[in-house]
Swiss-Prot record:
Homodimer. It is an enzyme of class 1 (oxidoreductase). Binds 1 FAD per subunit. InterPro entries: FAD/NAD-bd_sf, FAD/NAD-binding_dom, Fd--NADP_Rdtase_type_2, Ferredoxin-NADP_redctase_2. Its cofactor is FAD. FAD binds at E36, Q44, F49, V89, F123, D289, T329. This is Ferredoxin--NADP reductase. Belongs to the ferredoxin--NADP reductase type 2 family.
Amino acid sequence: MPEDNLYDISIIGGGPIGMFAATYAGMRSAKVQLLESLGQLGGQPQALFSEKTIYDIPGFSSISGKDLIRNLNTQLQQFNVDVYVNSPVLNIQKTEKNQFKIITNNRISYSKSIIISTGIGSFEPRRLRIANAEALENDKLFYTVNDPSIFENKTIAIAGGGDSAIDWALELNTIAKDTIVIHRRNQFRAMESNVDKLKESGSKIMTPYTIDNLSTDNSHNNLTIQLKKVRTKDTVELSVDALLVNYGFMSNNSILKSWDLDLITTKNNLIPVNSKLETNLQNVYAIGDIANYPGRIDLIAVGMGEAPMAVNNALESLYPEKIQPKHSTQLVKNIKNNENN
């Protein structure tokens, strides 16, 4: 086995939590690789919410998904981390040396420990289940927003009742001519403070309604949305320029089933971990939204705290004789001293 292909830590999943875990592992002078199945790092904030404003990142009153990932990438590049994108992990096997053989679609590597940070796994939006919806995608019907400017001075309908729907309604309300929020319940599931902002924003709120049909006129300029009021026969028609559907995302973590991990199958194959973020497999850790323990909540801020914990616990298990520096100042100073020697 070539030594340059053997890592102290392999991090599977290149979303924001995996990126910071790789950064911290590099800061600890570990030999580390970061494996990401998509063509770019960043996970959901980069692929799905690049223009969405995030308000619960420590140190930032607000930051867009793309800016968060850009900052994390700048931080990552300060340290010696091997990054592989377009590299979905197909299998993990235990070797006779009590190490891990990691097989991706394009290479084989070995690792002394693994940190899983796959989040919700591979994901795609929950789509409208009506006959002609697919034909309207990326024209009048959208599930993600890559460029908010296309909605400038337009009448936009946003369907959904969770955080994403309300966040986008507030965001687009600043540039759109009119915004209309459609939800099948009278109560929203989004953060209460944002729901209050929505009610004060001037957006039109249509509850409890479901989308029954979509159609366009001959010129294809306007989209007509037929709404049906829940538990009644009442219908309403809306004429808008575009519809943004935020019904959440379907995820797939089924690949984890082949890795001998204990999984909570009733919770989308989440991985139970202990207070050290250890899984049932020795030297395998889980962090971020894929990890499960009592009281955990799915916030980027929570995962950011788990990242250095998992790295430190992994290195302590591998190299118990090494003294762990307490502060990043000393860690970076040590790296610079080694580079100068």
